[in-house]
């Protein structure tokens, strides 16, 4: 097979060689192919300054596979000066359907997105163009909750290079502990990519704990003109007990009567001001101040325009979500509970307005930990580009508001959702994607049970990776793959737990994936509202014909197989060191056969 690593002028033996040589001769740019991509320029002739700043690169998707630089370069040249173009190539000499173009400044990049998105490059072939995100931030899960920021920063510098900063958020319930994960900022995308490769499961442990590593969700930038009119503050790291009245009093202390209203949800809040000047003054005065025993972080909330809304909307929501088309201006709110996951905080003027089809009870109710109007953060890339490559999937078309997550006493008018699971059929294309974490309400569900069992047995935090596929009725379906860090580190060849069915709802897919993982591990999920975590080994004596004398006694794989033969509940054995390997290598569903 031909190597995908080429060097030289990048033209010899290529398709449209004559046209490409004519392009290079006309512009004076270099054209070199290496590591599966063909690079045009970078830098261009006569460029004697530093490379363009971050935000100057765009992603161009939906390219016809037989389209090359001789067609794309002239199109981009009309918009601005090209610093560099990188076209992804396959072994056959065709492009992979996408390319990256870096312009000399941000304004040219913005103009290119506006002019080229949905541009008809050929008859019936429309381009998909969005901003490219040069991601320099990694998500690292499985960190002991007792570790401080300085300790995490020091440890990350020991195991990876190019670490610039570490972002750690305190637990909502206990501010002396972290949330079990951190965001690590690197000096460049390359440094972050090298660190991600080094930190893959099984290679590195932190403080003796297996870790989970992935790209952090890239932050969407809001233009300066839009931010200059914002008069709403986002306040995080509040105590759960801190009231809206207490927040309003604190912010009004800077200028009495400046606050219009406060909306607090869990450990964060939005503070609305009558004018921007008062908001900025309060932000400068109160950012970092201790309120009710907790140092708070105060920033300007980020609004989203119509284009950004459409780009992020896929018409999917959480449990009991209804999709409704609206004729008034499009806008939405990102669920701020995910801001600690790296997602931006957005607000909208309609955020706290009642939607016409919502029926509010006579008695006073409350909002749950989700916003009135929200949509999952979906990072799907054109042409199945791997996660973290660039940009967000531009969907175009009409926008919809996906509203969900209302607390007790609120009802959504419409047909009752029919829960249904769909078979994972051969040939279905599963696309990696991220989403807002949906927190179960009221009862303890399978994801909570799985997390508690993993914590109890020091297996690390379960990592959920969301995939989607299009069903036979053209409906978007969802499936989560689950990775347990301890199992992955002990058995690098083992694939993530993959359930056999997809769901039309994201939260249902996550619940089913957790249930499937528990079942694969031999842990029952029935009656799981309390005490469903893995029992200690001392409870093993309740199983007839098999008793484990103490928690320190070794348990062999043969003994566990005997327990399976006797039909015993394996949950009693999950605390033993041999159990993870036994469970994965002996159970079905693609992980082995009994």
Swiss-Prot record:
Annotated localization: Nucleus; Endoplasmic reticulum; Cytoplasm
Pfam families hit by this protein: DND1_DSRM, RRM_1
Keywords (A to Z) from UniProt: Cytoplasm, Endoplasmic reticulum, mRNA processing, Nucleus, Phosphoprotein, Repeat, RNA-binding
One Gene Ontology molecular-function label: mRNA binding
Entry keyword Phosphoprotein: yes
Domain notes: The RRM domains are necessary but not sufficient for binding to APOB mRNA. Additional residues in the pre-RRM and C-terminal regions are required for RNA-binding and for complementing APOBEC1 activity.
Quaternary structure and partners: Part of the apolipoprotein B mRNA editing complex with APOBEC1. Interacts with TNPO2; TNPO2 may be responsible for transport of A1CF into the nucleus. Interacts with SYNCRIP. Interacts with CELF2/CUGBP2. Interacts with RBM47.
Protein name: APOBEC1 complementation factor
Source organism phylogeny: Eukaryota, Metazoa, Chordata, Craniata, Vertebrata
Gene: A1cf
């Amino acid at each position: 097979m031909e190597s995908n690593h080429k060097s030289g002028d990048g033209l010899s033996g290529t398709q449209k060689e004559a046209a490409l040589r004519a392009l290079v001769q006309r512009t004076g740019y270099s054209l070199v192919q290496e590591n599966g991509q063909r690079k045009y320029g970078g830098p261009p002739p006569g460029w004697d300054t530093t490379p363009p700043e971050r935000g100057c690169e765009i992603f161009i998707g939906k390219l016809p596979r037989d389209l090359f630089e001789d067609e794309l370069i002239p199109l981009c040249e009309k918009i601005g000066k090209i610093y560099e173009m990188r076209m992804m190539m396959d072994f056959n000499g065709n492009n992979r359907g996408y390319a990256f173009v870096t312009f000399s400044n941000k304004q040219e990049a913005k103009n290119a997105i506006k002019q080229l998105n949905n541009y008809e490059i050929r008859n019936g072939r429309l381009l998909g163009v969005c901003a490219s995100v040069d991601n320099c931030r990694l998500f690292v899960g499985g960190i002991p909750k007792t570790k401080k920021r300085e300790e995490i920063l020091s440890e990350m510098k020991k195991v990876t290079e190019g670490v610039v900063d570490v972002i750690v958020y305190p637990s909502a319930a206990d501010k002396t502990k972290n949330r079990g994960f951190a965001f690590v900022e690197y000096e460049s995308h390359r440094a972050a990519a090298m660190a991600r490769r080094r930190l893959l499961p099984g290679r590195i442990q932190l403080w003796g704990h297996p870790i989970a590593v992935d790209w952090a969700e890239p932050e969407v930038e809001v233009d300066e003109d839009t931010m200059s009119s914002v008069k709403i503050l986002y306040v995080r790291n509040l105590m759960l007990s801190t009231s809206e009245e207490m927040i309003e009093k604190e912010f009004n202390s800077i200028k009495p009567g400046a606050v219009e209203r406060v909306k607090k949800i869990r450990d964060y809040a939005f503070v609305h001001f009558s004018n921007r000047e008062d908001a900025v003054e309060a932000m400068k005065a109160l950012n970092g101040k201790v309120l009710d025993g907790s140092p708070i972080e105060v920033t300007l909330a980020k609004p989203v325009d119509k284009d950004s809304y459409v780009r992020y909307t896929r018409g999917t929501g959480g449990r009991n979500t209804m999709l409704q088309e609206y004729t008034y201006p499009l806008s939405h709110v990102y669920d701020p509970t995910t801001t600690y996951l790296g997602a931006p905080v957005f607000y909208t003027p309609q955020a706290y307005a009642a939607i016409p089809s919502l029926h509010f009870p006579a008695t006073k109710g409350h909002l749950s930990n989700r916003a009135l109007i929200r949509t999952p953060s979906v990072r799907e890339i054109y042409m199945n580009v791997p996660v973290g490559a660039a940009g967000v999937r531009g969907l175009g078309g009409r926008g919809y508001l996906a509203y969900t997550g209302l607390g007790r006493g609120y009802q959504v008018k419409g047909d009752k959702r029919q829960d249904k699971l769909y078979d994972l059929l051969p040939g279905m294309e599963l696309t990696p994607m991220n989403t807002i974490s949906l927190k179960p309400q009221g009862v303890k569900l399978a994801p909570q049970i799985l997390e508690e069992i993993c914590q109890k047995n020091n297996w690390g935090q379960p990592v959920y990776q969301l995939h989607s596929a299009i069903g036979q009725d053209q409906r978007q379906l969802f499936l989560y793959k689950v990775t347990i860090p301890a199992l992955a580190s002990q058995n690098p060849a083992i694939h993530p737990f993959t359930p056999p069915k997809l769901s039309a709802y994201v939260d249902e897919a996550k619940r089913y994936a957790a249930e499937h993982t528990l079942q694969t591990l031999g842990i029952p999920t029935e009656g799981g509202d309390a005490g469903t975590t893995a029992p200690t080994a001392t409870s093993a004596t309740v199983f007839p014909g098999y008793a484990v004398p103490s928690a320190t006694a070794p348990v062999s794989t043969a003994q566990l197989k005997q327990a399976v033969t006797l039909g015993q509940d394996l949950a009693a054995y999950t605390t033993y060191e041999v159990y993870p390997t036994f469970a994965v290598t002996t159970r079905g569903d693609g992980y082995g056969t009994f």
